[in-house]
Amino acid sequence: TSDLASASIHKVNFGKFDRKIGVIELRKFYGSSGSGPKATDDVEELLEKLKAEETEGVILDLRRNGGGYLAEAINLAGLFISRGPVVQVKSTDGKIRKKFDFNPKLAWDGPLIVLVSRYSASASEIVAGALQNHKRAIIVGDKTTHGKGTVQSLIQMNLPFNFNASSGKKSAAKITIQKYYLPSGKSTQIQGVESDISMPTINTYLPIGESDLDNALPCDSIAPVNFRRPASEFVYELDDIQHLKEKSLERQQLLPEFVYLNKDVNWYKNKREETTLSLNLQNRRDQKIKNQKFSDSMSDDFEILSKNAFGRKDINLNIVDIQNTKSREVRGEDIDDSNATNLYKSPSNFDIRLHETCRVMSDWVGMIESRNLTHKKPELKDEI
């Protein structure tokens, strides 16, 4: 169950009260034509549980999602839009197929943020890009996603001399057969999906993107898909993004956790840029001591920062709860943990970028509330 979607609720301090921000982490778009679990069904189940907890905003965490089934990506995007295009697929013969979500049902119609990184690739870029094109979600995270906008297929090779015949292995070649394009017509290849609000990360300096590969196909564009969204569908306003970005940048310049993050990123960046290595034994020993002192200092700082983490409560899929209960029964443990599961606990690992994304969502919810109060019509009272 480690690859299944999971969720949590974070209590974000907002003035005199707390906001409940839901987070759904999805590491792959799993699913098949069989009876096994499907990413879309699991995310929909978690969204229902988050709504039952009166969550005010949802963050879809795709930072570790390298892709998966295209059909699941399309269906999952459909949980947040009523109808409309999700992706365009261009084949080697030049034919373009437009993939739509036709299901009008919405699993979540409130504020939505998609949290991404340079490791968010392929199908996760389709979901992030489509929701951005629909003005349905704000993208937060690394400056861009991975940039994998192509589809490969394994082609069996019939060789005149099959050197692997004795081992039973067959030769094959992986051939690029299709290319992905967003509803706007822009390809996700090389450039990926650009975040509306970005944060410092060492991923910027690592050769982990599609653009770092040899002979990667270029980014291009095709005609956009024209579509109309229902007037009642929740969408963000451009002014919202600018305001949220300014507030986030202000925090990134002032808060201790970003001082820590920038210090960490700069250290790794400088290490990667070093082009010489001393052969003097004493110099190497001195450098090792220096590195260890830096590491110890950063660990101490991180432990202090971790005390500021928001309270968190995990939300499990039904199948996960059932398996956890069975495991406790086997170990002879108390299975009545209803009180424990309702408690908000300090997370075991302080996630600075998720922490800031929760703040961005809290700011956004506050802006929406203020706007609704401003536009709310006064009630008319009958005169006596």
Task: Mark where each language-model region is.
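Generic structural signal for residues positioned in beta-strands
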Residues: 23, 85, 111, 172-176, ...
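Conserved functional hotspot residues or short segments at active or partner-binding sites
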Residues: 183-381
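A general structural signal for short secondary-structure boundary/capping elements
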Residues: 104-108, 161-165, 219-227
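Mixed-charge, polar/low-complexity N-terminal
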Residues: 3-4, 61, 67, 87-88, ...
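Cleft-lining beta-strand/loop regions that shape enzyme active-site pockets
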Residues: 1-162, 346, 350
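Polar, glycine-rich mid-to-C-terminal structural blocks
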Residues: 123, 135, 140-210
